[in-house]
Amino acid sequence: MGFKLSARSIGKLEGVEKDLVNVVLEAIELTKVDFGVTFGMRTLEEQQKLYDSGRSQTMKSKHLDGRAVDLVAYFGSDISWELNVYDDICDAMAEAARRKSVAIKWGAAWSEGDIRMYQGTAEDSMNAYIDLRRSEGRRPFIDAPHFEMM
């Protein structure tokens, strides 16, 4: 589709596992939706702030050891938080993960495992996760920008 990561996004990948970086670099070339990297490696202090604010549900984040990235969707210079665009980014990440043979989990479908193995679309997998959480009487935690190595 002709998208490229900005220098800022490339900088955010510093310290991230090489296999995950390669998936992100492949996905930006495959995606229908432009995206940038907002988080790669995180310090313990950054993680604590996110945990305290409720924006993260764990202090054992894979960001702490370079095994996770957060990707934000762009339309021109505007950020989009619409879930459907993250489905598209996930589809590109899944194809890139297949090509690079890297197991990746998506933060909008925690229960669904490796994105390379999804049956159907990323949206289908997210909906399966939401249905599962609701059937358990639990609220789903949708972190659509988040992708982590398994």
Regions found by a protein language model. Name each.
Residues 25-53:
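Extended, low-complexity, intrinsically disordered C-terminal regulatory tails
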Residues 1-36:
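Active-site acidic/histidine clusters and adjacent loop/turn architecture
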Residues 11-14, 42, 51, 80, ...:
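Generic, ordered loop/turn and secondary-structure boundary motif
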Residues 21-24, 47, 68, 90:
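A general structural signal for well-ordered alpha-helical packing
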Residues 50-62:
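Active-site-adjacent substructure of cysteine-protease-like catalytic cores
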Residues 60-150:
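Catalytic cores and adjacent binding grooves of peptidoglycan-active enzymes
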